[in-house]
């Protein structure tokens, strides 16, 4: 928060916006450790979810096309405003581009000053996995040891690491319609010392698992999981159904047990629960974390977490990355906002730059 007395003494105030590039975030993760980063983001998420009512929240603003979606995800409290820009284009691999690309901003509510601009493509993968783990710790059986990963794309390693380090999952059952994706995941998880088993279809992969994570990318009303695949005590972590017309769970799977979500107004539009009537009962996860509502009631109960990704999680992740960058002395700044001698004279800023370039132009002209 700005000190007004200090502001009055300053003739010119320079706004230096902290910047975290993709390369800098990767360096931060390597120095801190990916497991610690996932755990750290999870802790920040829990902290912010327990302050749920302090935030001004809304469903994300989405622009849909035939090939994908572009979204803005805002959230704010009394001190800080945050947003994420994110896309979802399942066919981007054809152009050698990620399916999901994102960046985000933290800004000061009092002045509107952008304090941080950060990549969020890598960070979103970490926060999504961290959020899945936060939900599973509240909803899955505490003795869970095996998890099926249906969909072995860019998010899958992060999910596996989150569930291994935060919940103690020991073995991962893997399936993807793209065998190359599973090859990649097996290689990466084996390198990290995690146990994997690959399967030829979803039904075989989920059999006997304590937790089932679906994280597929196709923008279609799919039925990755059907009711006959669900076993007593399972926790379903549905990650991939995250926009209108994009689902992973058969509607009857949602009737197998209590359904939990992040922000109900958004989840009813975007989650697997978009298939259900408006009065279908759901519980927001913050209510479970705060103790207001019950999560899992008994060991054989099936629990379903219908995740779509919510702006508050990105706020948490941005806070974490900013704080760790500061801790590791890895901050850098950019000049995003012009420094004005007179805040009412924006045109003068352009003129000053033109005048400063005058001698350079004259020297170039003489040399010619």
Enumerate the predicted regions with their spans:
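NAD(P)-binding Rossmann-fold cofactor-contacting core
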Residues: 166-192
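Rossmann-fold NAD(P)-binding glycine/threonine-rich loop
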Residues: 229-234, 238-294
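Short, well-ordered coil/turn residues at beta-beta hairpins
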Residues: 213-216, 238-239, 262, 318
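N-terminal ligand-binding/catalytic initiation module
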Residues: 1-125, 133, 143, 312-315, ...
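Glycine-rich Rossmann-fold phosphate-binding loop(s) that bind the pyrophosphate
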Residues: 152-153
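Rossmann-fold NAD(P) dinucleotide-binding segment
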Residues: 203, 208, 219-235, 251
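N-terminal Rossmann-fold NAD(P) dinucleotide-binding loop
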Residues: 156-157
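Short helix-loop-beta connector
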Residues: 139-146, 168, 231-232
